[in-house]
């Protein structure tokens, strides 16, 4: 499919890109996974809503938070079930043995049901298929046209500080108030702050209550810091 080819081209461009461009390419890949692709496996349709990029290239992108599993190398378009940590499922996009690249499916819709990182593998395995069955599947990326509003932020609960400030998460902003994204609230604070400052600039006479209502409308919750942001 053309959209898988687009992903492949971006991945191929990643290796020789400068650092800032690498981050941009990883964001573009995440954006395309959310808006342009769905994953079809054994009758389960997975629609990504929040994905996090994990890339390891020893000389050009040494992200120690990447598991560096062999299943994150040269397995473009195949699933990787985590072998350690909290548990989870990634879609591998590496097309070479030279580097690891996969995207954690942190929040998804699976056959229309909202699932978090640890819920997704349980849901998949409840089909009666094994991890190996899922990981052996190929050609699981299919075209989608989701048209979400995509934003970026940092990754959640990193074990190591490297690339912790890099905006390597892509997420569907319009999904945030609809589903339970409490796991992401710490990482979303800066997004909320930036949105609120822009809102106040466009509505200079808005009250604190109006700002709180707007935050809730867009993000589904109101950080405690809203009062500080409004009155400073």
Show where each model-derived region lies.
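Basic, alpha-helical nucleic-acid-binding regions used in initiation and control of genome expression
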Residues: 188-232
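A cross-family signal for N-terminal binding/gating loops and helix N-caps
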Residues: 1-190
């Amino acid at each position: 499919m053309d959209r898988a080819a687009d992903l492949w081209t971006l991945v191929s461009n990643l290796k020789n890109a400068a650092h800032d461009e690498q981050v941009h390419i990883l964001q573009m890949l995440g954006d395309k996974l959310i808006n342009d692709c769905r994953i079809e496996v054994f009758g389960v349709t997975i629609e990504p809503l929040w994905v996090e990029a994990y890339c390891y290239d020893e000389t050009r992108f040494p992200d120690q938070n990447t598991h560096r599993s062999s299943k994150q190398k040269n397995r473009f378009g195949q699933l990787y079930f985590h072998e350690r940590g909290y548990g989870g499922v990634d879609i591998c996009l590496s097309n070479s043995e030279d580097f690891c690249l996969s995207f954690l499916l942190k929040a998804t819709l699976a056959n229309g049901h909202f699932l978090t990182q640890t819920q997704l593998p349980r849901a998949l395995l409840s089909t009666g298929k094994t991890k190996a069955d899922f990981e052996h599947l190929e050609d699981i990326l299919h075209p989608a046209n989701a048209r979400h509003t995509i934003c970026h932020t940092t990754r959640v609960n990193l074990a190591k500080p490297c690339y912790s400030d890099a905006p390597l998460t892509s997420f569907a902003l319009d999904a945030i108030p609809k589903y339970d994204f409490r796991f992401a609230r710490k990482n979303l604070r800066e997004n909320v702050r930036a949105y609120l400052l822009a809102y106040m600039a466009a509505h200079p006479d808005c009250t604190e209550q109006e700002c709180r209502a707007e935050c809730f409308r867009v993000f589904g919750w109101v950080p405690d810091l809203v009062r500080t942001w409004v009155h400073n």
